[in-house]
Design a protein with these regions (language model features):
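Extended catalytic/binding region for NAD+/ADP-ribose chemistry, centered on the ART fold
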Residues: 69-74
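Long, compositionally biased stretches
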Residues: 2-67, 87-93, 97-160
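Short active-site loop/helix that positions an aromatic residue
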Residues: 76-86
Length: 160
């Protein structure tokens, strides 16, 4: 099927590419069908594009890019919602909030997105204990502390 998007224009999406979030995402409970879009120029970032809302797309990344010891404590209920037997069957991503300056880009570690890509199911899992932030700096203090220049690649905002 062809879908019209505000970010990518018209794109072809196969039914077997659609990931269903039965409960939607926090703040977007009505939007339940998404497709993951890769953009090699924006790696390691990925896009989560709504199939039904052409203006709704999120940037996401694997949490271990920023936090090596990121841990989830999933219950059997979470696994059941994703039709998974164990966490190894799942892919984990976190939402990214872009900024004009790379040093200010943040990720939401408190509300990761869990995917069972084989079953095409997704779930936003909210970590209740306050262990993680919704505004964790993606690069931590690496860019500030080492007086490194910001990466020369364009931000996702600039690529549009």
């Amino acid at each position: 099927m062809l879908i019209q998007t505000s970010r990518f224009g018209e794109i072809e999406v196969e039914e077997n590419q659609i990931i269903t979030f039965p409960s939607g995402l926090v703040g977007f409970s009505e939007d339940r069908r998404f497709v993951i879009r890769e953009d090699n120029a924006a790696a390691p970032f990925l896009w989560l594009q709504s199939v039904d809302n052409n203006g709704l797309a999120f940037v996401m990344i694997e949490p271990h890019v920023s936090v090596s010891n990121y841990e989830l404590a999933l219950t059997q209920e979470h696994l059941k919602k994703l039709d998974a037997k164990n966490i190894e069957e799942l892919s984990v991503f976190v939402l990214v909030t872009m900024s004009k300056e790379m040093k200010d880009v943040t990720i939401n570690l408190q509300g990761p997105l869990l995917f069972n890509l084989e079953k095409r199911l997704g779930l936003q899992f909210i970590i209740p204990d306050g262990k993680y932030s919704t505004r964790h700096l993606l690069f931590g203090d690496k860019l500030k502390d080492n007086n490194q220049e910001e990466p020369s690649s364009k931000t996702l905002e600039e690529q549009q």
